[in-house]
UniProtKB/Swiss-Prot annotation:
It comes from Pseudomonas paraeruginosa (strain DSM 24068 / PA7) (Pseudomonas aeruginosa (strain PA7)). Pathway: Pyrimidine metabolism; dTTP biosynthesis. SUPFAM superfamilies: Thymidylate synthase/dCMP hydroxymethylase (SSF55831). This is Thymidylate synthase. PANTHER family: THYMIDYLATE SYNTHASE, THYMIDYLATE SYNTHASE 1. The keyword Transferase applies.
Length: 264
């Protein structure tokens, strides 16, 4: 994952210090892009060990349309704990916007189901887009969406995905986001009868928190290892039928985990 280390190095060398919502402070650049060929391996960071279980369960949780952390807690995933209320609710976050976007006439739009239908009927469409950024409901969300919008693209029988991430916590968040959307692309490709193409990550405010600099510098001393591969259960033909057991990460080698505090 040289691309990821290049981003981290770029921010260390060119980042501007900015204050932020959490009061921690960041070193930030605006606008950056990384490209990953999904045929060359599954883009899971190898310069520190990543928790794939959390990535998979979070994605399945999004696809369920859920906005309560009960499913995550049931499966030992704590990444949303800091933002949930006493009942485990997060407000109308990702899952709600993906699966139940409220329309002015009272309908709810299932963006994911619509996307899958459009992919099969008109794969050349330039409208293969899902947005989590709903300005009318931002204030009701425990945390506004950082990965705000993604678009699929089909060419030569291959499915590619581009994500726009408005706010990118490079050390803690971005490795999760890359792996999550790469996995989503593999899942959608299988169900749509396509081959995986590229995952393209586009970041807006790309930042390292001031209390992550030591960890980032340690990671930059490490040499990337060969990428693993991700196997999906070929029997799954519907996107919403995937379960945790349908994924197998093969050949993942990684340097030791690096701990860092979460800015809330």
């Amino acid at each position: 994952m040289k691309q990821y280390l290049d981003l981290m190095r770029h921010v260390r060398e060119h980042g501007t210090f900015k204050s932020d919502r959490t009061g921690t402070g960041t070193y930030s650049v605006f606008g950056y892009q990384m490209r990953f060929d999904l045929a060359a391996g599954f883009p899971l960071v190898t310069t520190k060990k990543c928790h794939l279980k959390s990535i998979v369960h979070e994605l399945l949780w999004f696809l369920q349309g859920s906005t309560n952390i009960a499913y995550l807690k049931e499966h030992g995933v704590s990444i949303w704990d800091e933002w949930a209320d006493e009942n485990g609710d997060l407000g109308p976050v990702y899952g709600y916007q993906w699966r139940s976007w409220p329309a002015p006439d009272g309908r709810h739009i299932d963006q994911i189901a619509n996307l899958m239908t459009m992919l099969k009927k008109n794969p050349d469409s330039r409208r293969l887009i899902v947005s989590a950024w709903n300005p009318a409901l931002i204030d009701e969300m425990a945390l506004p969406p950082c990965h705000a919008l993604f678009q699929f693209y089909v060419a030569d029988g291959k499915l590619s995905c581009q994500l726009y991430q408005r706010s990118a916590d490079i050390f803690l968040g971005v490795p999760f986001n890359i792996a999550s959307y790469a996995l989503l692309t593999l899942m959608v490709a299988q169900v749509a009868g396509l081959r995986p193409g590229e995952f393209i990550w586009t970041g807006g405010d790309c930042h390292l928190y001031a209390n992550h600099l030591e960890q980032a510098d340690l990671q930059l001393t490490r040499e990337p290892l060969p990428l693993p591969s991700m196997k999906l259960n070929p029997e799954v033909k519907d996107l919403f039928d995937f379960r945790f057991e349908d994924f197998e990460l093969v050949g993942y080698q990684a340097h030791p985990h690096i701990k860092a505090p979460v800015a809330v």
